[in-house]
């Protein structure tokens, strides 16, 4: 586990890279969802959490806690455990396991790509803090975007219409 300090400049770079990567990952995820929507029915897996929790509680449990816990586990432990098979393999495997831990085919591509991003940020900075900050930044963009860019906060999570429409060629 690389608990090295991270410079302010690296923090800023991590946040900027994450913000710039977000629309690209969203587009790729949308393309994937658009393709599989023809054969797979999507779930409403997050709707209850939105409707039964306060926004601040949701921010805590969707942004802060996963950022810390998931990054310590996936980048701090899994990535480093499989490093003996080569760094690229370890990055891909830890990213695959990270994506699978998100429980659903409709939520596979984005976490997989984010896992690769998080692992590379850790590699570049030498610190677990980089993927934690990136993960938090990504999650808060997603939550705030869902809250402020849609009329109905829970509707974005009760269907995958936004992600599918972003990836739709129509």
Role assignments for model-derived ranges:
Residues 6, 37-38, 82-88, 126:
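Juxtamembrane helix-boundary/capping and inter-helix hinge elements in multi-pass membrane proteins
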Residues 1, 12-28, 56, 76-82, ...:
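Gram-positive cell-envelope targeting signals
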Residues 2-69:
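Juxtamembrane helix-loop-helix connectors linking adjacent transmembrane helices
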Residues 44-108:
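Function-critical hydrophobic alpha-helical transmembrane segments in multi-pass membrane proteins
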Residues 25, 29, 33, 69-70, ...:
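Membrane-water interface at transmembrane helix exits
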Residues 11, 15, 19, 59-64, ...:
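Residue-level signature of the transmembrane alpha-helical core
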């Amino acid at each position: 586990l690389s608990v090295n300090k991270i410079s302010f400049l690296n923090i800023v770079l991590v946040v900027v890279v994450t913000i710039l990567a977000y629309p690209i990952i969203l587009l790729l995820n949308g393309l994937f969802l658009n393709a599989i929507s023809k054969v797979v029915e999507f779930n409403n897996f997050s709707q209850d959490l939105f409707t039964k929790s306060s926004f601040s509680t949701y921010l805590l449990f969707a942004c802060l806690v996963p950022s810390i816990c998931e990054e310590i586990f996936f980048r701090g432990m899994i990535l480093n455990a499989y490093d003996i098979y080569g760094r690229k393999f370890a990055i891909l495997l830890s990213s695959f396991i990270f994506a699978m831990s998100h429980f659903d085919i409709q939520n596979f591509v984005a976490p997989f790509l984010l896992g690769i991003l998080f692992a590379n940020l850790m590699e570049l900075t030498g610190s677990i803090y980089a993927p934690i900050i990136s993960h938090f930044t990504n999650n808060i963009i997603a939550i705030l975007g869902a809250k402020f860019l849609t009329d109905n906060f829970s509707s974005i999570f009760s269907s995958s219409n936004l992600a599918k429409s972003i990836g739709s060629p129509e």
